[in-house]
């Protein structure tokens, strides 16, 4: 619950502690890279069992700033992208809107309204959709500012870390290789015609004449 001040305070403390770890990880990555991860695995069975993390640290060393810069970025991040992210999360989690349900108008938190998207009653699903369309624009400016600030910070840091493209940094963060990502994208593209046919059939079953309505999507 984002309204619990004690929880918010503890989260801030955790973020400060996490920021202290960043320069230490940068130092560890440089150390692993200087010794070579493949050579380190020969030191012991334990090292060999952790070759994967060692290789990731070695790759990280290629794409990181100096230890001091990484430490400064981590500290600034607590009042930068992290703060913007929490603002967006707090605003959206505390958002409420009136939903004109068949049983009467009811004020509901946006998360509960989102849950009505799978209700069996068409009238309920449509009422929930219309309520969402009324609610989200009221926080659009704040959410856009938060997302732009987070993305802007990421783009700046990724350049300093010498990533060729933002997608490369994202793939590394998620432990996904370029080959795997390409294969996933190809699989999605190949399945889109079948997916579109399924959407058209579902629209017909619901009686939609101009494409599948959002409230019938789920």
Which functions belong to the PLM regions below?
Residues 1-218:
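A well-structured
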């Amino acid at each position: 619950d984002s309204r619990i001040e004690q929880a918010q305070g503890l989260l801030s403390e955790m973020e400060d502690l996490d920021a202290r770890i960043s320069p230490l990880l940068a130092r560890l990555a440089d150390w692993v890279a200087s010794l070579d991860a493949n050579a380190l695995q020969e030191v012991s069975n334990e090292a060999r069992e952790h070759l994967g993390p060692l290789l990731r640290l070695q790759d990280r060393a290629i794409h990181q700033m100096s230890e001091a810069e990484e430490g400064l970025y981590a500290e600034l991040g607590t009042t930068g992208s992290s703060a913007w992210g929490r603002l967006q999360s707090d605003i959206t989690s505390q958002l409420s809107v009136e939903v004109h349900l068949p049983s009467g108008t009811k004020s509901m938190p946006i998360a509960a309204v989102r849950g009505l998207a799978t209700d069996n009653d068409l009238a309920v699903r449509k009422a929930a959709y219309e309520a969402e369309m009324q609610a989200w624009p009221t926080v659009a400016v704040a959410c856009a500012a938060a997302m732009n600030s987070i993305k802007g910070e990421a783009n700046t840091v990724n350049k300093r870390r010498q990533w060729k493209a933002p997608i490369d940094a994202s793939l590394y963060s998620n432990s996904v290789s370029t080959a795997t990502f390409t294969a996933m994208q190809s699989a999605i593209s190949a399945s889109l015609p079948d997916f579109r046919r399924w959407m058209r059939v579902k629209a017909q079953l619901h009686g939609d004449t101009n494409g599948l309505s959002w409230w019938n999507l789920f």
